[in-house]
Amino acid sequence: MKLHIALWLCVSSICISYSQIKQDTINTKTTQLPEVIVTGNSNTDPTHSTVKNDYQKKGIQPKNVADLFSEINGFSTIKRGNYAIDPTFRASAYEQLNVMYDGGTKAVHACPNRMDPVTTHVIPEEIEKIEVVKGPYTVRYGATFGGIINMVTKDPNKLDKGFHGKASAGYETNGNALVNMLQLQHVSNKFNITGNIGYRDFDDYEDGQNTTIPSAFRSTDYGLKLGYNLTAKQYIQGHWRQSFGRDIKHVGLPMDTEFDNSTIVSLDYRAEDISNTLKGITAKGFYSYVDHLMTNENRANFNMVFASSPVTSTTIGGKLETHWLFNNNVNLYVGTDANLIGRDGTRTRTIKMMNGNMLPNPMVRQDKIWQDASLNDIGVFSEAKYQINKTTFTAGLRLDFVNANAENLENDFASIYGNDVKQSETNISSTLSLKHNISSNTIMEVAYGRGVRTANMAERFINHFTVGQDSYEYLGNPLLKPEINNQFEIGFQGHSKLNELNNFSYQLSAFYSVYDNYISAVVDTSIPRKFMPMLQPQFTKVFTNIDDAYKTGLEFMFKFELLEDYYFQNQSAYVRTKNKDFGESLPLNPPFTSTFSIGVDKENYWAKAQYNLTSKQSHIAPSFGETETAGYETLDVKLGATLFKNITLGVACLNVFDETYSNHLNFSYRNQPDFNMSPITEPGRNFTAFLQYKF
């Protein structure tokens, strides 16, 4: 707790002390908080990075956060229902991706089955853009193994002075889904304030065979953001956000969510142009708390046992960074950051039936879920960018000091690992890259990154819970080594003007990763199943490190812009993983995907037809219960127009041909009386409408 308080005092003291710096009172510009990616600035942009930034312009359908990733090449989603959806990029998922809001704010899920991933704690319509760093190619934003995802909310400082607002409403026919949001903003020379509130109500959807898939949920979100210009070159911003999920069905998990409440608070500070050499100081502090309750009250096994699991997660973190400029061509970033996680929770089981017979007096048992676990990471880093002629070199080094512990162990867990499971690590990450302008319209990027990920809490401390995509109970291992990703990548991007009306652009990337100490799980026949021991599988999986694994793949995009406003585009992504120790792929390896889009993009209207091709996936991990999945093809059509000056209407038909299909990454139906253990099917044909009014 002392460390938590110290982090907040550090941020506050920096803000107060630098606010005393004498500044010119004439406000010629407004200082803005830094973003991970500043598009077009090769001096500061991370190598192999991209940005998707048309969410605010073309809100043409109601969506959950997963939809925000659907058009970014290389992304897929892991689906357990219509709510608990995780992004995956190049076969990296969960903590292998460094997912954040606004450059560093994080909220860690409380549920061991990830019913409440980080992407559920923000209003999707609030996101202005998503920034992606495609590998461990920067050390400035925390420990990064497979890449960075930064979801950026709207910056009020980019608006004109005065009062602004927008109201939006959307509807989907498949699932009778309704979404609403209201946002109000005021911007002046000295301060800005933004408030928003959103409500979402989704019912069960139907797949292409008109089978009803349990997937309903409701959520209410609100947020308040306040920014203040201390001087012309200093800016401070506070952000308060709360989300309340209710009655959430998870068709691919053994339980459902009764409620999921989260609170996220952040404080950001930035000072610019402090001296000729010291160009800036940024500081961030954040706090998040997730309160989650899951039960099996509406599940098939409720008559045999009632299970109720209240769990909590607390995350406290911060960052302090200085930006130095030497000789006008060397940018140096030096700083420190922290990410402190605590989790706890207990499952209470009321056993009503044993050996097929109803008990006259039900038995009550309690199981420790997180065993009062903590995982603290304090990092220090330095990253330099050196520009000479047409080439920018980047080199970075990072040290992470990790401490993990669980203080309330179950007896059987302690009998295996002892009563003291506290572990400490010092992890070294690094990157080296270059970005070269071959010509005025062609860029080459070459990069190496060494990303290190410490084992997460489930991998360390979970005790006989089914937390994977298979039916095994999993046992944590506090002795796990951190996994290492040595990733190499080369990429080209460019554009050319074919004539006065037509243009061509392209991107191509190829990557290869060598994994050391990759964290997986193996069946241990000496450890039997703990709960319901008569069921299969009979034994327990234990998390372990494997010696020999790799990942390779490529991504390709080309786009023809025709007659200025029309376009044809293709995006394709392929990734192949291999676990040589097991003689199979790593789990959750997405299949080859390719999309073909044709559309028009004019100032007052736009339209797009997109053909989505997903291949059969035969590169699977049978030891994790994976089976081959068939390929499929779908067609989406989206239209939008500005009806009046401030009113936008978007309509769409998704899955036009009402296909029945399952993505390879979807979990299988679990604890459902009317479904076998087959992968969750996706929604069938779906008509959507989205209306937005800006003022």
Which positions does each model-derived feature cover?
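Short acidic/polar hinge/loop motifs at secondary-structure boundaries
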Residues: 106-135
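Transmembrane beta-barrel wall of Gram-negative outer-membrane proteins
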Residues: 173-201, 210-246, 257-273, 326-330, ...
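C-terminal beta-signal and adjacent terminal beta-strands/loops
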Residues: 452, 516-517, 521, 568, ...
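Gram-negative outer-membrane beta-barrel transporters
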Residues: 327-328, 387-389, 402, 505-515, ...
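N-terminal periplasmic accessory domains that precede
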Residues: 35, 65-68, 85-88, 97-100, ...
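Flexible loop and strand-edge segments within Gram-negative outer membrane beta-barrel domains
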Residues: 21-22, 202-203, 208-209, 217, ...
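Outer membrane beta-barrel strand-and-loop segments of large Gram-negative receptors
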Residues: 223-225, 309-322, 375-379, 475-481, ...
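N-terminal periplasmic "start-of-domain" segments of outer-membrane beta-barrel proteins
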Residues: 30-66, 86
